[in-house]
Design a protein with these regions (language model features):
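N-terminal TM1-TM2 helical hairpin plus the immediately adjacent luminal interfacial "cap"
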Residues: 33-94, 116, 126-127
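N-terminal signal-anchor transmembrane alpha helix
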Residues: 2-45
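Aromatic-anchored segments of alpha-helical transmembrane domains
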Residues: 26-31, 105-114, 163-177, 212-226
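Membrane-interface helix/loop boundary segments of multi-pass membrane proteins
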Residues: 83-101, 148-155
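Membrane-interface micro-motifs in multi-pass membrane enzymes
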Residues: 128-148, 179-189
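Hydrophobic, membrane-inserted alpha-helices
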Residues: 61, 79-86, 141-147, 163-173, ...
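C-terminal transmembrane module of polytopic alpha-helical membrane proteins
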Residues: 1-10, 173-260
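Hydrophobic alpha-helical transmembrane segments of integral membrane proteins
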Residues: 96-128
Length: 260
């Protein structure tokens, strides 16, 4: 029995960051649900990484915003998030998962904030956007999704890159440039770049392929979501995958054969 418990604990320990974060999200959501919508709205206002809070130097919002969500019931999307983070932790180990999530969450937040500030200064956006709430885990999750690019087998990597970049850009365009969709595109690119520095991933197994399927579906719902259609980004994704894969194949065919 002790041997079995030790083996189970060892397996659980391999995804400890994922489990800790999921438990923290669930706990915060439960407490806010108990305290009521008024308190929930007030907490969102205080931890939001909008221009108002960042402009006042509330740097702590860069951390706190990742633990508070404004979207539907947590049980709807938490399983997908757990699958995505668990896969990242199994492929890259705990430390690199934390780095990927932090780069996606904090990096995309700051880049989007800088873009919004520049657009307001240029008169392209109304100043009312400075108070729009911006909380949740989506930037960090998409950053982790981006790192999978470096772990995907080489023969499928070009199609993977083309699909996700086209989905992200397509969703941003369809949404009319809404800053959250733009942030997802930024987080995705940051994750792809960070993944190139992670070295060799752990080997793929049937379990990890299964997690990838769930993570990809969840990632599409996050990245491709907009108020108009979920199909438009998918169309862009298919086109992007075909174009990038075709281009990569053409380049590969034109490479000169090695001299023996």
């Amino acid at each position: 029995m002790e041997v079995v418990l030790t083996a189970v604990w060892a397996r659980v320990g391999r995804v400890r960051v994922t489990l800790f974060y999921a438990a923290a999200l669930a706990m915060v959501a439960k407490v806010l649900l108990y305290l009521g919508p008024g308190v929930h709205s007030e907490v969102i206002r205080h931890v939001s990484t909008n221009l108002h809070n960042l402009g006042e130097g509330r740097i702590g919002t860069l951390i706190g915003s990742a633990f508070v969500t404004a979207d539907g019931p947590i049980y709807v999307w938490l399983p997908g998030l757990v699958a995505m983070l668990a896969l990242g932790e199994l492929l890259w180990r705990s430390g690199r998962l934390a780095v990927a999530f932090a780069v996606g969450h904090i990096g995309a937040t700051l880049i989007v904030a800088a873009g919004l500030a520049a657009a307001i200064a240029a008169g392209l956006l109304s100043t009312s956007i400075v108070n729009v709430a911006d909380v949740g885990m989506s930037y960090g999750a998409v950053g982790v999704l981006g790192t999978f690019t470096a772990a995907i087998p080489h023969r499928w990597r070009a199609a993977w890159i083309g699909w996700w970049l086209a989905v992200a850009v397509g969703a941003a365009v369809v949404s009319g440039g809404y800053f959250t969709n733009a942030g997802h595109a930024v987080a995705l690119v940051l994750g792809m770049l960070v993944g190139t520095r992670f070295g060799q991933p752990e080997r793929w197994t049937a379990t990890r392929w299964g997690l990838l399927a769930v993570a990809a579906a969840f990632g599409y719902l996050v990245v491709g979501y907009n108020s108009l259609s979920l199909l438009a980004p998918a169309s862009c994704g298919v086109l992007g995958a075909l174009v990038v894969w075709g281009g990569a194949s053409l380049i590969g065919q034109r490479r000169p054969a090695p001299i023996l």
